[in-house]
C-alpha cells in the first residue's frame, strides 16, 4: 500500500506542469503561493529569472531566483511553460522578453497589467496569452483619481456610443468612480445589449439606464436630458470607418456634425456642467470625410466655449488597439483564415494605444478643462503597419511570407501614410499630466457664423452628392485636402454604385 502511494505521488509530480517565472516581484510571489496551496492547479514552479542582480540566489517560497532574463535559453532545469510576471513591464520590455521566450520554443503567457485587474488580484486564473496590447500599448497610466472623482462621484453621467470600443471602456472606468447614475446611449441594439448586461453583472452598485437611440434624433435627446439631467457628457458616438464614410459622406455629416450639435443644444438647455468630445488625430489636416467632420465638431465646441456655462473640451488621439473594424482584428481574421494578410502600403504608420489607456486619459483630460480646450494624448512613437502584421503572424506561431503571405493592395481613399497630431495654426502646450498635451489655437470662431457654415454643410449632405459635401467641408475647413478630390472617375463610379444599390 505504501509503495502504491509513493508511486502515485511520483507519478503526480511527473505530470505536473513545470513553470518558469520571469520577474521576482509580488506577482510571482502570489502565484507561487497559490500553486503551493492549491493541489488542483497541477503545476509546480521550478525557477525564477529576474534582471535585478541583487536577487539572484534568493528564493521565493523555496523557489530559486536563477539569474537574468536573457539566460532563459541556457537554463538547464527542465520546464514546460514560461509565465511573465511583470505587470508593470512597458511594451518595449515586453517585446524583448517575448523574443527571449520565443527562442526557447516553449509556450509562454503573461499576467495582466494592473489596469486590467479591476480587483487588483494576480492569480493563475488571470494569466493569459500575450496580446498585441502587450507589445504595442502596454503603458501604465498614472491617474489623479481625486480630480476625476470630483467631477464624476455622485454625478449623473451620459455616455454616447456607450456600447462601442471607447464608449464601453469609458463606462467601465466611470463605474469605479461611483456616479449616481450612468446613462448609456447607443443606436446599436447589439452593442447596447452587451454593455447593459455587463453593467448589470458589475460588482459596483451603480444605477444605470440603457437608452436605445440616435444622437441625430433631437427630440429624443431633449427627452433624455429633461428626464435625467446629466451633469457630465462623454460624447463617443461617431461614424469612424474612413473608407465607408468616403462613400457615404452625408452619413458622417448627419452623425459627426449634426449629432454633436444636437447634443450641445441639449447640454445648454438642461445645465450640463462638463462635455467631453472624443475626437481623432484624423481631424488634423484631414484628407478624409471622417477627419473633416470631426474637425468641424472640434470647432463647434471651441466656439461655443467662448460664451457658455458648459465646460466643453475635446480629446484627440490615434488608433486604439483592438477597436472594432480596425487593422489588428482584421489582420487576426486574415491569419485565422490562412492569409493573405493585406497591407495597403509598406510605409504606412499609425499611432497606437490600448483602449483602457485611451479611456483613462479621456477621463483625466475631462478633469483638466475649463472650456474650449483640445487635448492630445501622447501616443508614443508611430508604428509601421507592416511590423504589426509580422508580429501578429508570429504571435500565432507562424512565419510571415512563409506560412502566411503578405499582399500589398495600395492605399484606400482618404488614407494618409502618416497621421499628425496638430494643425499648422496650433501650438502644443504641456499640462500637469505627462501624457496629455493641450492645443492652443489663437483663432476664435464666431458662433453665429459657425452655425451658418454648419447649416450649409448639412444642407449639402441632404443632396446626397459626394462632390457637394466635399466642397462645403473644404470651404469651412481649408486644410481639408481630399486625396482624390480631382479624380472625377472615382466620384462618378462611387455615385453610380450608391445610386444603383
Place the predicted regions along the sequence by residue.
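A solvent-exposed beta-alpha-beta segment
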Residues: 3-110, 114-119, 190-194, 201, ...
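Conserved S-adenosyl-L-methionine
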Residues: 40-42, 175-181
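Flexible, Lys/Arg-rich cytosolic regulatory linkers and terminal tails that connect or flank
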Residues: 56, 94-156, 268
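NAD(P)-cofactor binding segment of oxidoreductase domains
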Residues: 95-111, 181-188, 227, 232, ...
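Conserved Rossmann-fold NAD(P)-dependent oxidoreductase catalytic core, especially the SDR/UDP-sugar
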Residues: 119-120, 235, 239-298, 303-305
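Strand-loop microenvironment adjacent to phosphate/nucleotide-handling motifs in alpha/beta enzyme folds
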Residues: 142, 147-151, 299, 303-320, ...
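N-terminal Rossmann NAD(P)H-binding glycine-rich loop of SDR-like oxidoreductase domains
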Residues: 157-175
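Conserved Rossmann-fold cofactor-binding substructure of NAD(P)-dependent oxidoreductases
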Residues: 212-232
Amino acid at each position: 500500500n505504501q509503495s502504491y502511494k509513493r508511486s502515485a505521488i511520483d507519478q503526480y509530480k511527473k505530470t505536473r506542469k513545470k513553470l518558469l517565472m520571469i520577474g521576482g516581484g509580488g506577482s510571482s510571489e502570489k502565484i507561487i503561493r497559490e500553486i503551493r496551496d492549491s493541489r488542483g492547479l497541477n503545476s509546480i514552479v521550478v525557477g525564477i529569472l529576474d534582471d535585478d542582480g541583487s536577487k539572484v540566489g534568493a528564493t521565493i517560497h523555496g523557489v530559486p531566483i536563477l539569474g537574468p532574463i536573457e539566460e532563459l535559453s541556457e537554463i538547464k532545469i527542465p520546464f514546460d511553460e514560461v509565465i511573465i510576471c511583470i505587470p508593470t513591464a512597458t511594451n518595449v520590455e515586453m517585446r524583448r522578453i517575448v523574443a527571449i521566450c520565443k527562442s526557447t520554443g516553449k509556450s509562454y503567457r503573461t499576467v495582466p497589467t494592473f489596469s486590467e485587474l479591476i480587483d487588483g488580484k494576480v492569480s493563475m486564473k488571470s494569466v493569459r496569452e500575450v496580446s498585441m496590447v502587450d507589445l504595442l500599448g502596454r503603458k501604465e497610466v498614472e491617474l489623479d483619481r481625486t480630480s476625476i472623482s470630483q467631477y464624476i462621484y455622485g454625478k449623473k453621467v451620459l455616455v454616447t456610443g456607450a456600447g462601442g470600443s471607447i464608449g464601453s471602456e469609458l463606462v467601465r472606468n466611470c463605474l469605479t468612480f461611483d456616479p449616481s447614475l450612468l446613462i448609456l446611449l447607443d443606436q446599436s441594439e447589439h452593442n447596447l445589449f452587451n454593455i447593459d448586461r455587463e453593467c448589470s453583472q458589475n460588482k459596483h452598485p451603480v444605477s444605470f439606464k440603457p437608452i436605445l437611440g440616435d444622437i441625430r434624433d433631437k427630440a429624443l435627446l431633449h427627452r433624455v436630458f429633461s428626464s435625467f439631467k446629466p451633469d457630465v457628457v462623454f460624447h463617443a458616438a461617431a461614424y469612424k470607418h474612413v473608407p465607408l464614410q468616403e462613400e457615404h459622406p452625408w452619413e458622417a455629416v448627419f452623425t459627426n456634425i449634426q449629432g454633436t450639435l444636437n447634443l450641445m443644444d441639449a447640454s445648454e438647455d438642461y445645465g450640463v456642467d462638463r462635455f467631453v468630445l472624443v475626437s481623432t488625430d484624423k481631424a488634423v489636416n484631414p484628407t478624409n470625410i471622417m477627419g473633416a467632420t470631426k474637425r468641424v465638431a472640434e470647432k463647434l465646441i471651441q466656439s461655443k466655449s467662448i460664451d457658455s456655462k458648459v465646460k466643453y473640451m475635446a480629446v484627440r488621439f490615434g488608433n486604439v488597439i483592438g477597436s472594432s473594424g480596425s487593422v489588428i482584428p482584421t489582420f487576426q481574421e486574415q491569419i485565422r483564415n490562412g492569409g493573405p494578410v493585406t497591407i495597403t502600403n509598406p510605409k504606412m504608420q499609425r499611432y497606437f494605444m490600448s483602449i483602457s489607456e485611451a479611456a483613462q486619459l479621456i477621463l483625466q483630460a475631462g478633469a483638466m478643462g475649463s472650456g474650449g480646450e483640445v487635448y492630445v494624448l501622447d501616443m508614443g512613437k508611430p508604428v509601421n503597419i507592416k511590423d504589426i502584421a509580422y508580429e501578429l503572424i508570429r504571435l500565432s506561431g507562424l512565419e510571415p511570407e512563409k506560412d502566411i503571405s503578405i499582399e500589398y493592395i495600395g492605399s484606400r481613399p482618404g488614407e494618409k501614410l502618416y497621421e499628425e497630431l496638430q494643425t499648422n495654426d496650433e501650438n502644443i502646450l504641456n499640462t500637469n499630466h505627462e501624457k496629455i498635451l493641450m492645443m492652443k489655437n489663437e483663432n476664435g470662431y464666431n458662433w453665429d457664423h459657425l452655425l451658418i457654415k454648419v447649416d450649409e454643410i448639412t444642407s449639402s449632405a441632404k443632396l446626397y452628392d459626394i462632390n457637394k459635401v466635399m466642397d462645403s467641408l473644404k470651404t469651412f475647413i481649408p486644410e481639408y485636402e481630399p486625396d482624390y478630390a480631382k479624380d472625377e472617375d472615382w466620384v462618378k463610379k462611387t455615385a453610380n454604385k450608391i445610386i444603383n444599390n
